[in-house]
């Protein structure tokens, strides 16, 4: 299991995540398509939180990694281990931290929101394109805006881009009108099986729901207003994060555009 530092979230994002992880309550949501590394980030969060002093319970389908000091429950509808009934049973055990693999429907969202507001820290995942779309998605799932504003603490939207092979990457011959700076592109060698890429790199955006954003969500402000507010507090989009990593030579502009735009 990765630790949070090895996720390569960037200093500011890591600082935000660590601060919110150590709060006594609230909801942290990880979003992105299948295969975007959400589970890895979730497990890294649990790994950071695990402690003898904390009661941590997770409900998963499947259990991808075993974590010491975490009570992990495997969901299995065939034998009656249903998601929402398990979630209610977990709440009766009064844990400090709850991790649920995915918020699947309105009922599980309702239970999760209420858990976050009654002294539990809750971590879960959702399928949305970016961090701000998560607010709309929760509203579409019939959540009340005042509940979202009070419960939601952090949204991390993420993608995985292919990492340029460190042994054969070369300076890009292309000139991008939109982007300033020097970039790299794949070449291909024996070490990367002539693909030009070697491994994956995480690009993520971390949207902290502070007082101002919570107020705007409560007032049902649109995405443009929310983005302006987030930017005021230094929010960087996935694309901006990716651009930074492309300038560092970790990935190429073409790969970034393929994954994020």
Residue ranges of model-derived segments:
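Short, flexible helix-loop junctions that flank or precede catalytic/ligand sites
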Residues: 1-261
